[in-house]
Structure formats: C-alpha cells, structure tokens
Amino acid sequence: MNKIYTETEGIILPKEISLVPYSNEVDYRTFSAVLDDNKMSATYKMYWLLALLEEIQLHNFDIDFKKLISRMVTFAWYPILKYKLSFGLCDNLVKVVNYIEDTYCLESNCDEKKLLDFIYNCEDKILNKMLKDLTYNVPYRFLSPFFREHTRGERSKVEKIIEELSRTDAECVYEIYIDENKRKRIKIRENWCNYLKNNYRILQGWAYYKLVIFLQKRNLNVPGIAMKLEAPKKRNLTAQTKIWKEIIETNHINDIYTGLEFTKENYNEYGVLSMDHFIPWSFVLHDQIWNLVPTFKNINSKKSDNLLNYDKYIDKFCDLQYKAFSFVVDKKRNNQIEEYRELLRIEDAKKFKEEKTIEEFYKMIKKKVMPVYNIAVNQGFCVVEELG
C-alpha cells in the first residue's frame, strides 16, 4: 500500500492512501510498485515515469532511450540549479546537469523545450556518454515489479532478463528493443498507452509525490520541496512594492546595499524601485515582508539569487525591518502584521512594539533569520561580500 505523509509540527507521519487508478485493462496493482521507495537511492524512476507521461501526451508511444533520458535531465534542471536541492550521492543526474551548465553556460531559467532539444541533439561525446550511462538501469528496473519471479536471486543478468521478457510479456508497460540504427527504444503497449494517457494528471501527481518524499529525506530543513520541482511561476510584487514606497517616504530610509537615497536621480541611474529577497526567493519561496528589501532594479539584478555577507548587512537589515514593522503596526496593515507575528511568534504586535526595545527586536529577527541563512549557505547558495 502506498503512503502519503502529513506534516505535524515538522514531523513527517505516514498515512495510508489508495493505490494508483483502478483499471480492468492493465495490471495496475503491479504498476503501483514501480516507484516503491523502500530501497530507492536515486530519482531516476520518478523522472523516468514523468518523461513517459510527457511523451504519451505528445502521442509518442515508440521512444528512444536518449529522448527519455534527455527529458529526465530537463526535469531535474530547475531543482538542481535554481533551488540547489541535493539529490543524494548516488544520483548522476546532478553530474549531467552541472556538466551542461559549466560547459555551455546555460541559464538556470533556460526554456524547457529549448533545453530538451539542446540535450537531445547535442553531439558532445562526453555528454552523450553521460546520458548513455543513465540508460543502463532505469529502463529495465522500472519494469522489475512485473518480473520478480524471474529475477529473484539474480544480480548480473537482471537487465538482460527483463529486456528479453519485456518483448513477450503482454502485461508489462512496454517492450525494450533495438532499432535498425542500433539504438535502444521502448514501445508502450496499447492498453498501457490508454491507461497512462487517461490518468495523466493523477499519475503525474503520484510521481511528484514520491519525488517529494525522496528529496525531503535528503534536504532536511529545506522549505517548500514540493514547490521546487518545476520552473518558478511569475510573481506579482505590486502590493509589496506599494507598501515599501510608503515606508520609504515615511522613514526616509536609504538602500541598505549601496547606502544611496531613493531619489529621482538615483532611480534614473540605478533603475526603478525593486523588491529584493534578503534570503533568495528560490530558497524561501515566499514574498513576506520580513524578507523583503527595497533596492534599485540594477542592484537587485546584480545580487540575483545570491546571499550577502551576513555580518556586514544583518544590522542594516534589522534596522530596515524594525522601521517596516513599526509602520505596518501603526497603519494597522493586518496582512503584514500577521507575517511578523508568525515570524516572531508574538501574540500582540502593537503591545510588542510598545513594550520591547529595538535591541530586542533585532535579537528576535536574527534568531529567526540566521538559521535560514545558514541552511541556504549549506544548500549551495553563493555569498557575495558587497554590491557597491
């Protein structure tokens, strides 16, 4: 039986859920074991299934290994480069992604279709060797639940046994064969084509769910794993920018990264007002006011997804946040007050402002921000000394 895990105060607890969608045309019960995570040491099977589902949506039922592996690399691109997620020591998708980025200087936000086409059509011998190495296990092991009786006790011949059986066993998802150009391919059986196509969304969600569980174990304390599996969606910071404009006008604050005033002349030279995330958005995945820093667009672009030197900027950040906190409390901006209340774990923000000193506010902000900052550093986010 598959399990879904629910979070209770940071502890992940198992809760039984039903099997994959029922069917009287395919062996769905055996299929439900293809992503059995008891001994899983890499993301390959989840990404292989996601690649299969995408190809089927495009009405491709006879697919070469390289196309599916190329899709797997494309799917892993954002989680690895944009969100710095660890895939564990046994997962070689990371090596492929890093090789492509280092060799061809492709951006972390590279268009998915262009990236797929580039990987699939690239003639780089080193890259193609790395892609081929990824095909030695997953196409076969994915089918292993269908052939357990035949492979029990085998170690060195499992892939060969599964390949041969896949050609004659009508129950398994696809057959593995070699085409006239000596390329390995799979041909998805018609009944499985219908099942996978008709249940695309459910099975996609199942694969992502299994992926979240796998990655969560290897990225302890990293927030929002489920939201870090795909390219980030465009966000609208209009409301946050409006509030910060009011805070700037009320408090006459300067840009903490450059020390410059927010004047017309500086806007003309350094770009319009822009909201930066002190700890990168691609790590925290939210736009709450306590992590936002007003700066100039050009400066924000320069900072990008990096962290700044903690010791050099944390006091300036705390001072900025105290002014923002005081503003939203005085102006009764309830949404932003709630964000500070959740961060600082306080019941009454107004009472806190009246009774606590600015030094106590600094201390509480640092207590919350420093652990998140350190986890982001350990996750691989770069630290730069300054932006001036």
Label each PLM-derived region with a short phrase:
Residues 308-384, 388:
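C-terminal structured domain segments
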Residues 2-243, 311-328:
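Mixed-charge, low-complexity interaction segments
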Residues 232-238, 252-254, 260, 268-274:
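Active-site-proximal segments of catalytic enzyme domains
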Residues 248-253, 288-292:
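Short metal-coordination and nucleic-acid-contact micro-motifs, chiefly zinc-binding Cys/His arrays
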Residues 239-246, 280-284:
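Short, intrinsically disordered, charge-biased short linear motifs at domain edges
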Residues 259-294, 303-319:
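Histidine-centered nuclease catalytic patch
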